[in-house]
Amino acid sequence: MASSMLSSAAVVTSQLQATMVAPFTGLKSSAAFPVTRKTNTDITSIASNGGRVSCMKVWPPIGKKKFETLSYLPDLSDVELAKEVDYLLRNKWIPCVEFELEHGFVYREHGSTPGYYDGRYWTMWKLPLFGCTDSAQVLKEVQECKKEYPNALIRIIGFDNNRQVQCISFIAYKPPSFTDA
């Protein structure tokens, strides 16, 4: 008796659900959307490297250890570092200075699978610079870290506290004793 009641209730529910779904009416007309077209003067869509396009040559990756963003480029000057820090401040990211004394790159000492102790996590220099608005403050912290640990690799990261992610990371200082190979 109980099984017959359940089956009849299930039939009634499925009929009710079938009538509640609206039929598919198709896609909306594209006339309501604005149309954007490239002008003929845009040479970025040309497949060849002709014209006035100037490409920057990067450092060869062969025999070089890969670090972070911009790692294949030559070392950044203080002016270039300030521009990078200004970029992360403009994006409302929180700058943080980190350093590493032994390895500045990903390495696997105790196995082939990635883990916590494979060089991804560096030591934080002080606390993140919450409320920082000037790149000179960040570069001052880099100089203090360099003075305290002259043989350490130093990097600057930009942390987005809304999305809870690290958005940018680049090497700010390599010690003279460090070799890329």
Curated annotation (Swiss-Prot):
UniProt keyword annotations, A-Z: Calvin cycle, Carbon dioxide fixation, Chloroplast, Photorespiration, Photosynthesis, Plastid, Transit peptide
Functional summary from the UniProt entry: RuBisCO catalyzes two reactions: the carboxylation of D-ribulose 1,5-bisphosphate, the primary event in carbon dioxide fixation, as well as the oxidative fragmentation of the pentose substrate. Both reactions occur simultaneously and in competition at the same active site. Although the small subunit is not catalytic it is essential for maximal activity.
InterPro entries reported for this sequence: RuBisCO_ssu (IPR024681), RuBisCO_ssu_dom (IPR000894), RuBisCO_ssu_N (IPR024680), RuBisCO_ssu_sf (IPR036385)
Comment field (misc): The basic functional RuBisCO is composed of a large chain homodimer in a 'head-to-tail' conformation. In form I RuBisCO this homodimer is arranged in a barrel-like tetramer with the small subunits forming a tetrameric 'cap' on each end of the 'barrel'.
Record-linked Gene3D superfamilies: Ribulose bisphosphate carboxylase, small subunit (3.30.190.10)
Quaternary assembly: Heterohexadecamer of 8 large and 8 small subunits.
Family: Belongs to the RuBisCO small chain family.
Pfam families: RbcS, RuBisCO_small
GO cellular component, one term: chloroplast
GO molecular function: ribulose-bisphosphate carboxylase activity
Keyword check for Mitochondrion: no
FT transit peptide: 1-54
Organism phylogeny: Eukaryota, Viridiplantae, Streptophyta, Embryophyta, Tracheophyta
SMART domains, A to Z: RuBisCO_small
Gene Ontology biological process terms, A to Z: photorespiration; reductive pentose-phosphate cycle
Compartment list: Plastid, Chloroplast
Gene designation: RBCS
UniProt-recorded name of the protein: Ribulose bisphosphate carboxylase small subunit, chloroplastic
